[in-house]
Amino acid sequence: MARYEFFRQIFIVLSIVSPLVRSFTVITSDSTAPSALIDGPQTGFTMTNDGARTEPDEQDAVYDIMRATGNDWAAAIPDVCRGRWHGIECMPDQDNVYHVVSLSFGALSDDTAFPTCDPQRSYVSESLTRLKHLKALFFYRCLGRAPQRIPAFLGRLGSSLQTLVLRENGFLGPIPDELGNLTNLKVLDLHKNHLNGSIPLSFNRFSGLRSLDLSGNRLTGSIPGFVLPALSVLDLNQNLLTGPVPPTLTSCGSLIKIDLSRNRVTGPIPESINRLNQLVLLDLSYNRLSGPFPSSLQGLNSLQALMLKGNTKFSTTIPENAFKGLKNLMILVLSNTNIQGSIPKSLTRLNSLRVLHLEGNNLTGEIPLEFRDVKHLSELRLNDNSLTGPVPFERDTVWRMRRKLRLYNNAGLCVNRDSDLDDAFGSKSGSTVRLCDAETSRPAPSGTVQHLSREEDGALPDGATDVSSTSKSLGFSYLSAFFLVFPNFIFMLISS
């Protein structure tokens, strides 16, 4: 029921937000608009005054931009701001002259009518620099079959630009330093291109930047020492970045999400990370982190998801009080991190915890008896460790979690004969847990009960996905409902 209650609350939030935010469209408040512009952005406009018109040079620029994307039909529109086609937003000035403030290209979803791009011949037109009032520019899956570099002239779009989204366009080469000239940028999204080279140091000029997504590229070098006080979202996952997590990152006190997963980041997690008291998601999975388990994590009292999977150089124990202050933690993924020692009893006192993955480590000792009374967990993975002793779970816990309770490949685990768990463990398992010897509390030489973990043919159960990427894990489904729409949700935040 807790799972359905969580999704119910998410859908309530989305039902409130969705009328206010169109996919990949920024509605800027009057307070941030240039003084020469009045009212709000409009997709087309009603002619209440026959003198209303689009600024002629901007109209010609839009024609050029549309032709560059294969949309030659736009030249037949007598006035681009009153053409009533999605993908363009305009705003009037005090002389009733309309200016283009937003352009969007690419099919975001089945119900989005933004102009598509001709994949064979589309390119980014330099006429964009003639749109002096442009606040938002979106290109989504427009240029994949005609790979090219990000044009340096985009850095001349001026101080009005607040949102630049160039997702999945197959851009090659380095990120141009000139983008750092867009000093009023709030959202920069270059997700899933083929960019290489280092992250430009000029990005430190983005004093008002709130969301930076460079994920899914081939960027190299170290993570710059960003000091961006307004930054809420930092997503650099799936690159080739090296070096440590920069300590200056903790100066970005507005961070809600940090995803540095699937890079080659080394060294310890900075102790100063406890300054990020608004952080909700921290994903450092599949890097080369080392050092002791950071005690400073307990200061992240807003944290809801912590993923450190696949950092095999940790080789450390988990301190008993490591998660003391994480009262909001819902998802904890520490799989395959070479963690040693026993399972901390304090994990059972995290009352918000729903998903716990500790599989593939070197954990020893018994599963703490305190897990017997844990009612809030919906997914627990302890498989592939060296745990011993009786399984402490109550019958209803085993039934409730079913295949999401994984204990296989712990040769020392056993089930007490009087525990009434024999039929609670499913028959489709692929591994077994033996009955306990009454005298030693260790597995008896004979007699087994099946344990639910994976199907008999070795495949994962129906509906499950192997956690080859932490962000796709079953457990992460709780937060994915929020963060899958987060790129749109953040646009609402920056407009408030």
From Swiss-Prot:
Q: Which InterPro entries match?
A: At_inactive_RLKs (IPR050994), Leu-rich_rpt (IPR001611), Leu-rich_rpt_typical-subtyp (IPR003591), LRR_dom_sf (IPR032675)
Q: Where is the signal peptide?
A: 1-23
Tell me, using the record's free text, what induces this protein: Up-regulated by SPCH-SCRM module.
Positions annotated as glycosylated: N181, N196, N362
Question: Which tissues is this protein detected in according to the database?
Answer: In epidermal cells of developing shoots and leaves, but not in roots. Expressed in the stomatal cell lineage in the developing epidermis. Accumulates strongly in meristemoid mother cells (MMC) and meristemoids, somewhat less in meristemoid sister cells (stomatal-lineage ground cells, SLGC), and is barely detected in pavement cells.
Q: Which residues cross the membrane?
A: 474-494
Alphabetized UniProt keyword annotations: Cell membrane, Glycoprotein, Immunity, Innate immunity, Leucine-rich repeat, Membrane, Plant defense, Repeat, Signal, Transmembrane, Transmembrane helix
Residue ranges in the Extracellular topological domain are 24-473
Topological domains on the Cytoplasmic side lie at 495-496
The entry's cellular-component GO terms read: membrane; plasma membrane
List the residue ranges of the region (Disordered).
Answer: 438-464
GO:BP terms for this protein? Answer: asymmetric cell division; cellular response to abscisic acid stimulus; defense response to fungus; innate immune response; regulation of antifungal innate immune response; response to abscisic acid; stomatal complex formation; stomatal complex patterning
List the molecular function annotations (GO) for this entry.
peptide binding; receptor serine/threonine kinase binding
Localization (cell) = Cell membrane
Instruction: Report the gene knockout effect.
Output: Lack of stomata in stem, hypocotyl and on the adaxial side of the sepal. By contrast, cotyledons, anthers and abaxial side of the sepal have excess stomata, with many in direct contact and producing clusters. Altered responses to abscisic acid (ABA). Enhanced susceptibility to the necrotrophic fungus Plectosphaerella cucumerina BMM (PcBMM).
LRR repeat locations: 158-182, 183-208, 210-228, 229-252, 254-276, 277-300, 302-325, 326-350, 351-373, 375-401
How does the UniProt record describe the way this protein sits in the membrane? Single-pass type I membrane protein
Q: What else is known?
A: TMM lacks an intracellular kinase domain and may participate in active signal transduction only through physical interaction with other proteins. Overexpression of TMM leads to altered formation of trichomes.
Provide the function of this protein: Promotes cell fate progression in stomatal development. In leaves, needed to correctly orient spacing divisions, to limit the number of asymmetric divisions in neighbor cells, and to promote the asymmetric (amplifying) divisions of meristemoids. In stems, promotes the conversion of meristemoids into guard mother cells (GMC). Positively regulates CAPRICE (CPC) expression in differentiating stomaless-forming cell files. Forms constitutive complexes with ERECTA and ERL1 involved in the recognition of the stomatal regulatory peptides EPF1, EPF2 and EPFL9/STOMAGEN.
The UniProt similarity line reads:
Belongs to the RLP family.
Assembly and partners?
Forms heterodimer with ERECTA or ERL1 through their extracellular domains. Not able to form homodimer. Interacts with EPF2 but not with EPF1. Interacts with SERK1, SERK2, SERK3/BAK1 and SERK4. Interacts with EPFL9/STOMAGEN.
Its protein name is: Protein TOO MANY MOUTHS
